[in-house]
A protein has these predicted regions:
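Thiamine diphosphate
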Residues: 1-58, 63-86, 170-203
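Beta-sheet entry/capping signal
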Residues: 5, 31-32, 91-93, 195-197
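Short, flexible coil/turn micro-motifs enriched in small/turn-prone residues
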Residues: 7-9, 137, 197
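Generic beta-strand/beta-sheet core signal
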Residues: 9, 35, 95-97, 199-202
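Conserved active-site and cofactor/substrate-binding residues in soluble primary-metabolism enzymes
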Residues: 13-20, 49-53, 60, 69-79, ...
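Metal-ion/cofactor- or nucleotide/acyl-coenzyme-handling active-site neighborhoods
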Residues: 55-59, 106-109
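Conformationally flexible catalytic loops at phosphate/diphosphate-handling active centers
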Residues: 92-188
């Protein structure tokens, strides 16, 4: 609401506590990124190990989800998610497996400050800040709406979501030009004539 370009990190029960606000953030098309070390939720017992229960519980909130499978992907997708959220105005949940990836010790090619600057367009940051609440350009937000208006508001967000996959791939392509590391929305590995595939996510 104040125009800050923010990001945060959470996991497990902490993510569950954020779900009510995640609906608001997505509904208001506010660009932000949340990084999640995907972990088990406390049920009959407490477990702190890797699982996708937490991110799947937040799947219906309207946030785009971007998964990383290695420490290098985590580092790179953090920047790709930030670029994509600014272009799309859809908030992003960037997640990776708790402990298996979040605590892995490995070699990682670090991005420079210049790399970061080149992937975060100044004009999109300024646009984001211009959408902040201000007495200089007041507008109404957070009203109580009857079903007819509420439905129209939800429908008006569809173009932003429909454009998001293409914008994410464009961010990945721009990132590849910058670093030589190419990512895709989905990568196929296996025989070219396969008639069955297994879809897997994470490390």
């Amino acid at each position: 609401q104040a125009g800050a370009l923010s990001t945060t990190f959470t996991a497990s029960q902490g993510l569950l506590l954020m779900i009510p606000n995640m609906f608001k953030i997505a509904g208001e098309l506010t660009s932000t990124v949340m990084h999640v070390a995907a972990r088990s939720l406390a049920t009959q017992g407490l477990s702190i190990f890797g699982d996708h229960q937490d991110v799947m519980a937040a799947r219906q909130t309207g946030w785009a989800m971007l998964a990383s499978a290695s420490v290098q992907e985590c580092h790179d997708n953090a920047l790709i998610a930030q670029n994509a959220t600014l272009h799309s105005r859809v908030p992003f949940m960037h997640f990776f497996d708790g402990f298996r990836t979040s605590h892995e010790l490995n070699t990682c090619l670090m991005l420079s400050d210049d790399d970061l600057r080149s992937m975060i367009p100044d004009e999109l940051v300024r646009e984001h800040r211009r959408r902040a609440l201000s007495p200089e350009h007041p507008f109404i937000r957070g009203t109580a709406q009857n079903p007819d208006v509420y439905f129209q508001g939800r429908e008006s967000a569809n173009p932003f979501y429909l454009a998001t996959p293409g914008l994410v791939q464009q961010a990945m392509d721009d990132f590849a030009k910058l670093t030589g590391r190419q990512y895709h929305l989905v990568d196929y590995v296996g025989a070219p004539d396969a008639d069955r595939v297994a879809v897997i996510m994470g490390s």
